[in-house]
Amino acid sequence: MPDFLDIALPLLRLPTAPFHEHRIVAAIDTLIDDWSSTHTPLSIERDTAGNLIIRYEGANSGDWLYLTGHLDHPGFGFVEHLTRQDLLFERLGGLPVQFCRDAHVQIHSTRDLHPPLSGRITAYLEDTLFEGERRPAFRVSVDESTTAVGHDSFAVWDLPETDTKKRKLRATACDDLAGVAVGLTVLANLLKEGARSRVALLLTRAEETGFGGMLDYAASDQLDQEGVFINIECSSCLAGAPLGDGPVIRVGDRRWLFDPQVTAALVKAATDPSLAQLPYQRRLMDGGTCEATVLSRAGVRTAAVALPLANYHNTGRRGVRREAINLDDAEHLVELLTRVARTGATNLLHSGDSGQDEWLQ
């Protein structure tokens, strides 16, 4: 079965943006199809919002453990033609607008109706009126006719190719495609081992524009009230979690503290004396809000982990830059989540009970 890099590199080379995750979804469909056979306990489904739920059912009973991540990254959504060579794009998610002037973008089509077009941002329009609302937008100029660009088109930063160097993985959209790759690698490990557990990977859409996919899932009948959830994110290292010091076991975010029992179980799995000790960082990570808060507020047991991230949302010191994670952090996070996934949700909660007792002694 493939390892983390085998899965991450192809995904991270694909464009994505809120509401424009189709290339990532197609790649995951192909991957799961390659792994599946008539005897493989693996299935994939979509909910009404377009979220993916990949299930590994290695046991016939027991509560489900859900790993979650999101399929999008901040980008630009096409609005209208201004002239034959000038286009208006709306802002989709958090973008480093202070560096946008003259920055280059690649324009894609949701249905792949045209090859990527190169464009340049010529203006940031902070208060643009369209569809009855005032929203931030960008004017993008291209060197050729824009007749191929339509309402299914979107744009992403035009940055150097994804690569690895000195144990760092650099890509336009580590957040959260690296987290998605971690979850997929955990499923690959379970398949390889034939683990007797029930684990699902929930991959949501439009997280960067206000948790659209997760809010829809949390409000739907598909929300598993008996399940245990662990959110996988990439979170800025500026919150006090350096790259290379291990993945973060996240006790909370800006708005919420997560389930202490599940958090304790994660710590116990990392420090299990019968296995190799895994480096980890236990942090609040209050620089922003993540999908674990949505799930917690919906009433389900939720914890969170994160990969420390450099150049969060492509914000470098002097311009738009690729994001970066540490490969050791990613591989240790895969191992940590594989350990808890092997045990399943019920055993995870029992482990968390004893882990909390140890903290109080």
Where are these regions (language model features)?
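N-terminal hydrophobic/helix-forming segments and targeting peptides
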Residues: M1-Q361
